């Protein structure tokens, strides 16, 4: 068989005559017959092959000559090659636009022509296809063709709509052309939507339904499409990234794709903000309020800086946007305010400034309380000064906690209901002030946003414990007036419970200082890493508790045989110097033993000690269980925990600058508004500013019911609408500038990274071929049609 295919030589280069003629030398087991099992298309004629070859080589005059000679219609101008490409597709891939126009004029058709042009990003071909007017009215227009392609039942080589494909390629020019054709895009339904349409699509083909949703979101996440179709591209990028993050948690099969699209939206918002060139543009962008957000009318009339867009970025967890250099520089300017010279001072002067403000913070608070609108009051109102004053107030609270333990009266140790001391009342004032501050934040931020901050959660728990502590002290003082030794008290006596809650609240009070580390570039990343590690430890507990519960059940059933000691013991199990199996007589005791065994605080003997010399099997089973527990928990799970914590720390370390700047921005924003200017306990004193606001609001409400008041209110609303409209117009102007700069920078980046690729070489080859054919035509040379198959060497 091989000799018949290659009569001169075989595969090894030997002559065919040298092959043995014995039939046994060509056994059927030594060869494998190959056969094309795919659908065999009708082979093209010689003219059709010539036609496709001329289109491939870019020979305009040869293509035109073949089409002109096809008056009888013998040539099928829609023929395809072995790859399934027709003349239009080949011409688009080679970027021969003049031949493409010629083919369209002669009626060549291709359902995939527009998709091929978009996929190849040949802008000229897309323009020709969209603007081409066919001679025959029976042919479908481009709009109808796009509608056919968008139909799920229509099958093409690339099963995707043109606008979706253009968005996937992120080609701004092609998308501009397509959007002029009044195209539409199906709106993706929410994940888990149970409407009739989604249920039918999911039931018919769940894979196609999921892939279609992914293609739609790839289109919506295209920066080019966002810039073209959205008036507020930054807000749209925020919303899309949040939706894509939610989809990645539901559509776990396509998690990587959705997470990559979410990162793309975040980077687009960041790159768009990076195009701002001055502080005025940054102020317009970061203070813009969308129509869906609540508006601060008083702040708008007073031209107050609300940083609504920045707060929205933090809400959507846009770390790239917030940590962008322009945004951080603007935040620094707002943070220091009228104390901008503080950053340029020497370190010693910085320390002296902080210590001076920290020592005299009560005097400064009283000055602001009396004259908040004075020059001195405006300086105190700056976020940096508020941070120092609030910090000094909190350190004073911690100092009172230390004094509380130092001045504890030993004479009242056995008093079941001791009275409150002066220092107790001071602590209560501070606690009421901190609670009032949390209530104001809860009122303005809402419950959901308030609980998202771990700092607010810790503050809520801490204040609740302090409230419960002093409430129990009051109850104990009113109910108990006797003296008795503490060992004779009830285990849940109000005084004992109050002392326990107070001790735990003190621990949380000092741990709250961790959040002040966020302002430091050295301690801040460590504090963020610790928070991430605690989250990972919570995930680890889900696995550890299951293992602990499993071994606890086994050991309790093994040793809980109702054995009780006749002697009264002061200790049980691992708490005794001589540990024995009596610790496993209860579920809690077994949990204690297994838990402390991890830290080598429980001896292995308690797992294998026998109640009698005949219970060797029980001892052996106990040894096997503790050995298995030692392997699973002590060796495997603890090492897994170490690996998880190391991974969390490394993840934060790799993005240390971004994570720290984002956390610092969240802390700074809590001091930017004027809701909590004074620290505890001065914030519980009604200030003149608050009284003036209340009187002003009451007078406006009364005047609004009069004729003059209604006119004044309408004028105020009209002024407010004009200011809002003016701000929106300024925002659109700035956004147009940012979009234009973004496109320019992307074009320059593509040009700077443009190198000699296969496409560039192919384009050069086509240009040389066109030039050669034009020279031949000008000189009068005519190439034979069949000479194209056999060119001269």
Swiss-Prot record:
Gene Ontology biological-process annotations: calcium ion transmembrane transport; calcium ion transport; melanin biosynthetic process; positive regulation of release of sequestered calcium ion into cytosol; regulation of cardiac conduction; regulation of cytosolic calcium ion concentration; response to calcium ion
GO cellular component terms attached to this protein's record: cation channel complex; plasma membrane; receptor complex
GO molecular-function term, one example from the UniProt record: inositol 1,4,5 trisphosphate binding
Segments of this protein annotated with the region Disordered: 1-30
Positions with biased composition (Low complexity): 15-28
PTM info: Activation of PRKCA induces phosphorylation of TRPC1 and subsequent Ca2+ entry into cells.
Alphabetical UniProt keywords: ANK repeat, Calcium, Calcium channel, Calcium transport, Cell membrane, Disulfide bond, Ion channel, Ion transport, Membrane, Metal-binding, Phosphoprotein, Repeat, Transmembrane, Transmembrane helix, Transport, Zinc
Residues that, per the record, bind Zn(2+): 189, 193, 195, 198
Disulfide bond annotation, renumbered to this chain: 571-576
Reaction(s) catalysed (UniProt annotation): Ca(2+)(in) = Ca(2+)(out); Na(+)(in) = Na(+)(out); Li(+)(in) = Li(+)(out); Cs(+)(in) = Cs(+)(out)
The protein's name in its UniProt record: Short transient receptor potential channel 1
Subunit annotation: Heterotetramer with TRPC4 and/or TRPC5. Forms a heteromeric ion channel with TRPC4, with a 1:3 TRPC1:TRPC4 stoichiometry. Unlike other TRP channel proteins, does not form a homomeric channel. Interacts with TRPC4AP. Interacts with ITPR3. Interacts with MX1 and RNF24. Interacts with FKBP4. Interacts with PLSCR1. Interacts with PKD2L2. Forms a heterotetramer with PKD2 with a 2:2 stoichiometry; has distinct channel properties separate from PKD2 or TRPC1 homomers alone.
Species of origin: Homo sapiens
Superkingdom of origin organism: Eukaryota
Membrane topology summary: Multi-pass membrane protein
Tissue note: Seems to be ubiquitous.
Documented activity regulation: May be operated by a phosphatidylinositol second messenger system activated by receptor tyrosine kinases or G-protein coupled receptors. Also activated by intracellular calcium store depletion. Inhibited by xanthine-based inhibitor Pico145.
Localization, UniProt: Cell membrane
Family of the protein in this entry: Belongs to the transient receptor (TC 1.A.4) family. STrpC subfamily. TRPC1 sub-subfamily.
Repeat (ANK) residue spans along the chain: 46-75, 83-109, 111-156, 158-180
Intervals, Extracellular compartment: 405-422, 476-496, 559-623
Gene designation: TRPC1
Spans through the membrane: 387-404, 423-439, 456-475, 497-517, 537-558, 624-644
